[in-house]
Structure formats: C-alpha cells, structure tokens
Amino acid sequence: MQSSYFKNGILPIINRFYTKQIHFVGIGGIGMCGLAMLLLAQGYCITGSDIAQNDMIRSLLKLGIKIFFGHRDSNINQEINIVVISSAIDINNPEVQQAKRLKIPVIHRVKILSELMRYKYGIAIAGTHGKTTTVSMLTNIYVEAGLDPTFVNGGIIRSQGVSARLGYGNDFIAESDESDKSFLRLCPVVAVITNIDTDHMNTYHQNFEYLQEVFIKFLDKLPMYGYAVVCIDDPVVRKILPRINRKIITYGFSKDATLCIVKYYQYREKSNFTILIKNNKELQVVLNTPGYHNALNAAASIAVAIEEGIRDTVILKSMSNFTGTNRRFEFLGNYPLNIINGRVGKVMVIDDYGHHPAELRSTIIAIRTGWSDHRLVMVFQPHRFTRTHELYDNFVRVLSTVDVLLMLDIYSAGEQPIMGINAQSLCDSILKYAKVQPIFVQNECFLLKFLMNLLRDKDLLLIQGAGTISEIVKALFIKR
C-alpha cells in the first residue's frame, strides 16, 4: 500500500537503485515508528517487528506496513536490503543475527535521522523530561503557520494523528535521544534543552558530571549561526550556561529568563499564564494542557517560534488549539462505575507515560492543582530495573503522595533483574515511609478485582508508566 504521506525524495545514505525494502527491529519503539513513517513516505517498502501492540504499532498498521509480532530469524529474508535497530535491541536478537548471516547491513536509527535532518533546517528538542510535548507544541505552531514542517516525535501528536510526517517545508523538528548519546550524531541549527536530570545513568557510567559534559558537547555542535533555547529554572542547565558558546535564549518562571512566565493559573485541564519577553512584549497564553511543566514546554516552543519570526497571533492560536500528545496527561474519559463494580457514579481516567520520579511529581502536582476535590488513585508500572534501583528513594517519596496506589511488577524493557529491586520491595518501602498503603498487584489479571473494590464516585484514576500499563488498563475501560 502506498503511503498517503508520499513525497518525492531520496535518503542520501541509501541508494534507491539497490534499496527497496527496509526492516525495523522494534518498529513500535519511540524512536523507530516515526522514521519508518518518513521512509515509507519516501517510497521505500517498510516492514518491521515488535513484541506487542501499542498506539505506534496501530498507526503503522493503518499505513499498510507489514509488522511481525515476535522477534524471529524467519522475519528476515534476502529481499530486505537494510535492517534498522535502536540501542534497545540486543546484538543477539535473532533478527539481527539473521541479517548478519545474510550479509544485510544493520544500521542504527540515528544514522537515518541525522541524514534526514542534514538536508533541512534542523530543530532538535533535547532534555530528560518534556521533549515529546515540546515537539508536539512546536509542530502545532509550525503547522498553524503554514510552514509544513517535517517532524519526528516520540508520541502521536493528536492534532496531526501521527508521530511523524515528511513535509514540503524547510524545517525539521525532531525529538532527540540522550539515553544512548545518539543525539550527538544530529546536526541541528537550533537546540532546545528542557532540563538535565539523572536518567539512563548506565550510559554515563553512573557519572552525572559526564552526562552534563555530553549535553555541553551537543550544544557545541551547533553551527555558529545557530542558537540554544534552554530552561533557566533547571539548576543544572543554569550551571552549564557559562560554558555554552552559542547564542542563548532562556525561558522559565525565573525573573532573569529571556521569556519569563508569570501569573500562572490552572483550573481543571486549562492553564492561563503570561509570558514577559525582554523587549517588553507580553503574550497572554491559554493552554488546554495542565501543569507548570507544560507551561515550561509551551514557553520553549514559543521561544523558538518567536526567534524564527512566526507571528504572535499564530503562536497564541496554536497554543489555545493544542490538543496534546497520546499518553502525555491524556484524558481518556469519564467512565461509569457500573462497568467495573456496578456502583453509581463515574471515574475520570487519565493516561500518562511518565516513568521518572520528576515526571510523576509534575503530573501529581497538576492533578492536585486542577482536581483538588478528587481522590487520586494511581496504577503504576515501574519501568526498568536500573531506573528503579538508581532512583529508588525518589520513587518512594513521590509515590507516597497519592491517595491510593496500585503497583504492577517492573516492566524490564529487556533488562536483567537486579537482586532486591522489585515492585514488592518498593511497596514495602512506601508503607514504611508514608500513610498510603500500596497494593502490589502481582498478576495483572487481578487488577480488575482490586479496582472493583477500590474505585468510587469522582475518583481520578491515573494510569502511569512507560511499559504495557496503558494497554492493560484501557482494556478494562475502553473495551468493556
């Protein structure tokens, strides 16, 4: 099936005469889905494999891409010219091994992303948290301005219906990946740094100073005519500012920011705030996305848009029309309790991808600010043994701030278990730390039973995590 996003184009690192079919191992991954869409749009035959369905997989299936479920050497044949992997794919993956036996080149996804960006005006969004939403907001502005950008995002932008699209315009907006240092291979003109926090520390040899050095190196790669947009509220970003040798635009709630957020107010999911710009201009922003963290994401995208000459009216219209990103504080609906436990009333369900303590904290604060009259019930699935181990105490503190906590076992994401690090031990630590009494749901089949007993009218049910948690809980509500 030919993609409706087809544009005449050629990826320079792939010879179109010899290359017809490209296979993605782990095609449903955050960084893989979008690239598959872009290459499909350029006329390549795309296939892929993954272990389970998710929103990304479903969007690819709608485009006619053939996807195998499960990783097997039989998925790879000699008709495939290139196999694409990410850092999440083990070298011993049967498809990778079969490709090597058949002498099929195996390349990392970032090689394709960097080559695509090299031929356009690249805008790379980097940082530990907030990248996906910032890409979504900035893309929304560019589309509203009629600039038809190419974009690659880590989540489906609801207003666009996809996570990536090949545009006719000159601009390329991309989410970059610091988890494996692959963002150092990108060649943007503009770089946004939302924050720098402890995550993926195995990549950085458990050395936070090294992580900071890599971010500085990323900014040093900007051309002399390029610029960096950075969040000055973040203490680590503020610390490295003197070492950035490019034009800098700062944003945040801090009074010394180039774009300063003031008069922030939130009611339910809507937030209002003013952005003061150092040339004495003011922008009154209305955003249909809650949370201080999303005001910061909006300020980052607004900073780029202003610098690129996009009109204020376009920016503000785009902000007020912004409908969000899948699994980023996604409002799934108000569901009658009788579909779960036969009781009278409704429960509001929100789905969120956040899996780092800082992200959980931001989401909880947004809920407490906008829905202080609701009981907060969280179903949380920890993501990765290494992250849970490295940030254990932070998880204990932030998870202790909800009213009711149900915890599934850790989603490994392919990692080997770490002795003593599991959901049960995390629940035990939370119980010792706070009044909340966490419930460890050892088998996801029992989740419905627990929810039947716990949920009551006006509860806010928060589905939290980056693993399979969203699919599990959606099945309880949406498919019933």
UniProtKB/Swiss-Prot annotation:
Main localization (coarse): cytoplasm
Q: Which residues bind ATP?
A: 127-133
Q: Which is one Gene Ontology cellular component term of this protein? A: cytoplasm
Keyword Cell wall biogenesis/degradation part of the UniProt annotation: yes
Instruction: Offer an example of a GO molecular function term for this protein.
Output: UDP-N-acetylmuramate-L-alanine ligase activity
This entry's Enzyme Commission designation comes to 6.3.2.8
Q: Where in the cell is it found?
A: Cytoplasm
Q: Which Gene3D superfamilies did the record assign? A: Mur ligase, C-terminal domain (3.90.190.20), Mur-like, catalytic domain (3.40.1190.10), NAD(P)-binding Rossmann-like Domain (3.40.50.720)
- Which keywords describe this protein according to UniProt? ATP-binding, Cell cycle, Cell division, Cell shape, Cell wall biogenesis/degradation, Cytoplasm, Ligase, Nucleotide-binding, Peptidoglycan synthesis
SUPFAM superfamilies, alphabetically? MurCD N-terminal domain, MurD-like peptide ligases, catalytic domain, MurD-like peptide ligases, peptide-binding domain
This enzyme catalyses: UDP-N-acetyl-alpha-D-muramate + L-alanine + ATP = UDP-N-acetyl-alpha-D-muramoyl-L-alanine + ADP + phosphate + H(+)
**Pfam families on file:** Mur_ligase (PF01225), Mur_ligase_C (PF02875), Mur_ligase_M (PF08245)
The lineage's top-level taxon is Bacteria
UniProt-listed InterPro entries? Mur-like_cat_sf (IPR036565), Mur_ligase_C (IPR004101), Mur_ligase_C_dom_sf (IPR036615), Mur_ligase_cen (IPR013221), Mur_ligase_N (IPR000713), MurCDEF_pg_biosynth (IPR050061), UDP-N-AcMur_Ala_ligase_MurC (IPR005758)
HAMAP family reported for this sequence? MurC
The record's annotation in PANTHER family points to: UDP-N-ACETYLMURAMATE--L-ALANINE LIGASE, UDP-N-ACETYLMURAMATE--L-ALANINE LIGASE-RELATED
Entry's family note: Belongs to the MurCDEF family.
Can you say what this protein is called? UDP-N-acetylmuramate--L-alanine ligase
What gene, per UniProt, encodes this protein? murC
